[in-house]
Amino acid sequence: LDKLVPKLIRRVKNQGFNAVIIDPIYKVITGDENNASEMGAFCNQFDKICTETGCSTIYCHHHSKGAQGAKRAMDRASGSGVFARDPDAQLDMIQLETSEEFINENADNLSATGWRLECSLREFPNFKPVNFWFDYPIHKIDTTGSLNKVYAEGDTKNNLSKSGKRSQTPDSRK
């Protein structure tokens, strides 16, 4: 990214763009993704793009390995916690666990998958999660509410819905 940023700024500056999108960032990452100091310097390059071009910088990143459902949206990013603390806004898409039977009953297409969009916003209240179907190549908001009680892998609510034995989560008992 260190070499890309000056070129990017020259090309984008004074062009009237609203945003620069870098997808995915792992292809331009400089330094160790798990090192906070190195990722802080890396993320400062995004600020430089914003400052010098007047554009927002949007980047796409991936989740860490393993089940993500028990984590907050801001804690799912792979690598250093800088990826949770640096952005002014994070949008996180997570796939929901849907059975074949559920898909048959609720989706328009048998190849569709259920997803949830969550956010973490620095200056504003977070919006409510948005559920949607991904039916290649289109994302469609779930207007029926069928995905409201479906959860991502690792979410404790998912385990409760499967067992049917308890209606409380550890958080609700506090």
Language model regions located:
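Alpha-helical structural motif
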Residues: 4, 83, 115, 171-172
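Phosphate-binding/switch region of NTP-binding enzymes
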Residues: 19, 36-143
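Conserved inter-motif catalytic segment of the P-loop NTP-binding fold
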Residues: 1-37, 41, 48
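General structural signal for secondary-structure boundaries
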Residues: 2-3, 36-38, 73, 97-98, ...
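Intrinsically disordered, low-complexity regions
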Residues: 17, 32, 67-70, 80, ...
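Conserved alpha/beta core segments of nucleic-acid transaction machinery
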Residues: 122-174
